[in-house]
Regions:
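Asp-based, Mg2+/Mn2+-dependent phosphohydrolase catalytic module
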Residues: 1-4, 96, 112-214
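N-terminal helical cap/lid subdomain that shapes the substrate entry/recognition surface
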Residues: 2-101, 117
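Conserved SAM-binding loop
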Residues: 14, 87, 105-108, 142, ...
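Helix N-cap/beta->alpha junction signal
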Residues: 17, 89, 109-112, 170
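Residue-level detector of anion-binding/catalytic polar loops
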Residues: 35, 104, 183
Length: 214
């Protein structure tokens, strides 16, 4: 085994949530007077913790988002998850293989613990992720692109950073893994390869990943 721990991003890597979330985010920001297209939401906010969305909107417009922004946004997202969320193609087979081969793994997401739980329950991925394998930006002081979340996950899992590999689909996540001095495999299903500069290796389907990890 090349690594002692596989650290997965969640949204867009394990659960196919990015199209849902960014469609809702773009529409809600536009509704609030901050015109945003789906493509702009993907470009600017994919992989971000909620506080970073607030910071970017205020930086660009000089206006604060409403105090209930997070609650309204998550309410809309969770309702959509219940209707249509699916695992990323190949995620179930990959997790089955890692579990069968006794490869240690966890998830480290910019999303809240509630968002992770809702997504995993809806897609059936919760069977592979007990609480000890789930880490959120809520657990640390700084979210991606800071290394804190990945370093926290490695520490909690008892693995040295240099023995970890991160699986990411966002530029922020790749930067965070680089800052943590971990190898990172960049998933290009949603993000152009050119935007994942710094990735140790790129792949386009989860079916390719098992062979890269051994």
């Amino acid at each position: 085994m090349r690594y002692d721990l596989v650290i997965f991003d969640n949204d867009g890597v394990l659960v196919d949530s990015e199209p849902i979330s960014n469609t809702i985010l773009a529409a809600y920001l536009t509704e609030l007077g901050h015109p945003t297209s789906y493509e702009e939401s993907i470009r600017d906010y994919m992989g971000s913790a909620m506080h970073r969305i607030h910071e970017l909107v205020q930086e660009r417009s000089g206006q604060r988002l409403p105090e209930d922004f997070d609650d309204v946004f998550h309410g809309r997202v969770f309702a959509a998850f219940e209707r249509e969320l699916q695992p990323v193609p190949g995620a179930v087979q990959l997790l089955e293989k890692l579990a069968a081969d006794e490869v240690p793994y966890c998830v480290a997401s910019s999303g809240s613990h509630e968002r992770i739980r809702v997504g995993h329950r809806k897609t059936g991925l919760d069977r592979w992720f007990d609480e000890g394998r789930v880490f959120s930006s809520q657990d640390v002081g700084r979210g991606k692109p800071a290394p804190d979340l990945f370093l926290h996950a490695a520490e909690r899992m008892g693995v040295a950073p240099e023995r970890c590999v991160v699986v990411e689909d966002s530029p922020l996540g790749v930067r965070a893994a680089n800052a943590a001095e971990m190898d990172v495999y960049g998933f290009t299903a949603m993000t152009p390869a050119a935007k994942l500069t710094g990735a140790t290796q790129l792949f386009s389907e989860l079916g390719e990943l098992a062979d890269l990890l051994v």
